[in-house]
From Swiss-Prot:
Optimum pH is 10.5. It is a single-pass membrane protein. It is an enzyme of class 1 (oxidoreductase). This is Dimethylaniline monooxygenase [N-oxide-forming] 2.
Length: 535
């Protein structure tokens, strides 16, 4: 008899969890409190309590080839970075392809999840839900928590003396939808994350003046990298990940600084991070530097206090006649339907084995999917989490002892603090490629590069020096996909396809460029040789 699994939430984590359950022969039921799928990525004009909220102009920060599910590439004509509506379209295509909607009960809220009295032996759960005013209790063999962590706004008003007397408008960034109504205003955006940079850049096109207040600064990257390819297809390779792991910290820091300053000098723009040794997530924004050059945005230090109409900053400067303050200060999270004894959240910290499993449960039948913030795409990350969780539920994978899991949690937290710092915004941060490989190893889906080099050297080179995308984890192990190799070898054409909208005559510029590079290299070698000969 198939084990029954409850999936809480029908966002990206919930959808892929449903598919993984079906792939493993489990019987899933998904409870979604709203009327549709998509979670965070489904834009709505109004903010709704208990639901993630985005602004109309949001586009992905990770490219389509790095963000698709491992056995379902995005259509080749999709743009490389997707508007939220386009990403939602992909989710709909995905859900239809694998017939997932039949497992979802919409407008159904999970009230509580409790252990059954015989949990120590059965591992079962009682799930209480509410729909159309009626409550219902259902027993499940396992639970997948996919409710997200971008719902409860973090609004630290106590850190802003004088906010109670400020006459202007202030709100959290989750309430921002579009720039209409902000024309001609003087606006302060607090924070320097992706949302802060997006909102500040968008508002600066019609506002009288926009200020951005940041405590620590941030690296800012373009989505466009070398030769015009998406940034993450160049940044996230196994080779570059290996270098960041084995080289001395000072060398990695220097390399990172050089790479980040290649676009523009962050110190000149007032954005250089306070602690450059930390591998904090960079801001992805193609507009911010130009808006700073135009003077439409001005970078300020931390807010010291507010008056009725002005903002006083820590460096002593004052900006008068501020109309609006947007707090892009992140989110907190909790699980109101879970008892603290199951998953306890303290100061936005939670103790989960590999960011998924509560270590103290007698039976490993509850997993949190998506409670992580990788330095890369979240979509392949949650997919591997779901693949592992469903195999644990099925008994095909096992977890170590509670002592071992707790030791791993402590070690992982120490590494996180060492790499990313103690800031609240970095609490869920993790290295991208390392974490993917860690999960893949648990289910036997990590490629063996040594054997692959002898069997298929062309593919091995692509895997090691090319983008580390999700297709790699369908080459071996459970859930192999026969199209994985071809998807890896043809990703370049899917990147270029949406850009080929103008027919061009063939050009010899590429061969000439290549020849010039060869001649230049030859000239350097000859110059070095002649220098040795004393010419």
């Amino acid at each position: 008899m198939a084990k029954k699994v409850v999936v809480i939430g029908a966002g990206v984590s919930g959808l892929i969890s449903l598919k993984c359950c079906v792939d493993e022969g489990l019987e899933p039921t998904c409870f979604e409190r709203t009327e549709d799928i998509g979670g965070l990525w489904r834009f709505k004009e109004n903010v709704e309590d208990g639901r993630a909220s985005i602004y109309r102009s949001v586009i992905t920060n990770t490219s389509k080839e790095m963000s698709c599910f491992s056995d379902f590439p995005m259509p080749e004509d999709f743009p490389n970075f997707l508007h939220n509506s386009k990403l939602l379209e992909y989710f709909r295509i995905f859900a239809k392809k694998f017939d997932l909607l039949k497992y979802i009960q919409f407008q159904t809220t999970v009230i509580s999840v409790k252990k059954r009295p015989d949990f120590a032996s059965s591992g079962q759960w009682e799930v209480y839900t509410q729909s159309n005013g009626k409550e219902q209790r259902t027993v499940f063999d396992a639970v997948m928590v996919c409710s997200g962590h971008h719902i409860q706004p973090h609004l630290p008003l106590k850190s802003f003396p004088g906010i109670e007397r400020f006459r202007g408008q202030y709100f959290h960034s989750r309430e921002y939808k579009h720039p209409v109504g902000f024309e001609g205003k003087r606006i302060l955006v607090v924070g320097i994350g992706n949302s802060a940079a997006d909102i500040a850049s968008e508002l600066s096109k019609t506002a009288a003046q926009v200020f951005v207040s940041t405590r620590h600064g941030s690296w800012v990257m373009s989505r466009i990298s070398e030769d015009g390819y998406p940034w993450d297809m160049v940044f996230h390779t196994r080779f570059s990940s290996m270098l960041r792991n084995v080289l001395p910290r000072t060398v990695v820091k220097w390399m990172m600084e050089q790479q980040m300053n290649r676009w523009f000098n962050h110190e000149n723009y007032g954005l250089v991070p306070q602690n450059k040794y930390l591998m904090k997530e960079p801001v992805l924004n193609d507009d911010l530097p130009s808006r700073l050059l135009y003077g439409a945005i001005k970078v300020k230090t931390r807010v010291k206090e507010l008056t009725e109409t002005a903002v006083v900053f820590e460096d002593g400067t004052v900006e008068e006649d501020v109309d609006i303050i947007v707090f892009a200060t992140g989110y907190t999270f909790s699980f109101s339907f879970l008892e603290d004894s199951l998953v306890k959240v303290e100061d936005n910290r939670v103790s989960l084995y590999k960011a998924m499993f509560p270590p103290h449960l007698e039976k490993p039948t509850l997993a949190c999917i998506g409670l992580i913030q990788p330095l890369g795409s979240i979509f392949p990350t949650v997919e591997l989490q779901a693949r592992w969780a469903t195999r644990v539920f099925k008994g095909l994978c096992s977890l170590p002892s509670e002592t071992t899991m707790m030791a791993d949690i402590v070690e992982r937290n120490e590494k996180r603090v060492n790499l990313f710092g103690k800031s609240q915004s970095q609490i869920l941060q993790t290295n991208y490629v390392d974490y993917l490989d860690e999960l893949a190893l648990e289910i036997g889906a990590k490629p063996d590069f040594v054997s692959l080099f002898f069997k298929d050297p062309k593919l091995a080179v692509k895997l090691y020096f090319g983008p580390c995308n999700s297709y790699q984890y369908r080459l071996v192990g459970p859930g192999q996909w026969e199209g994985a190799r071809n998807a890896i070898l043809t990703q370049k054409q899917r990147i270029l396809k949406p850009l080929k909208t103008r027919t061009l005559q063939s050009s010899d510029s590429a061969p000439v460029s290549f020849l010039l590079k060869i001649l230049g290299l030859l000239a350097v070698v000859l110059a070095f040789f002649f220098q040795l000969q004393g010419f």
